[in-house]
Amino acid sequence: PTGPGDTINIQGVYTDGATRYNISELAGGWAGANTVFGGTSLPGAYQSVGFGFAPDSVFAVGTQQQLIQTWGMRGAYTHNWDAYWNTAIYGAYAGVRYNGTAKSYICGPTGSGVGGSFGAAFGTAGLTSCNPDYNIAQLGLITRWTPVKNLTFSADVTYVHLDQKYAGTITTSSGSIGKPSATYELKDQDTVQMLFRA
């Protein structure tokens, strides 16, 4: 059931070399970079990590830019309880795809990480799959209270799932990911955040 002023919004998007129009709000950070840490049950691993990078393009010295393709959709339903309160449920799902040449710049010519930028940064000894493609999903609920005009308080809970395609382990130096020098398991990550705004 809907009430006066309720809204339903749905959007779909496809980009080719314009990733920020799709991914930046989902992944956040520089160039849509999403690096998420979590727990692990892998013996010898310090933590787990998931990578989702979404630049507009990638290139190597002396080569052409390889455009990154993305697709996605998002939607929301807002219900107005009365003139002061409303609640919205929202969600989004997006995919980031690198072409074969772009993948070779990152994962090397054989896709093993050897000879690519990922292997150079994180090593390849424990890497079992090198693939920069990923999907990201988001589901959230926000409630807003507007006691007077131009003043709104809100509480927003968001769940995000990063479905990344790297597998195996990496061993890092402390500066490369801002964590202790250790072994990290590569795997999908889930996060929940709550924001209070005024």
Segment roles from a protein language model:
Residues 140-143, 149, 154, 192:
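Mobile, glycine-rich extracellular loop/lid and propeptide segments
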Residues 150, 154-177:
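C-terminal beta-signal and adjacent terminal beta-strands/loops
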Residues 80, 132, 146, 187-189:
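Surface-exposed coil/turn segments at beta-strand junctions on protein surfaces, enriched
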Residues 1-2, 78-84, 144-150, 160, ...:
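Structural signature of outer-membrane beta-barrel channels/translocons
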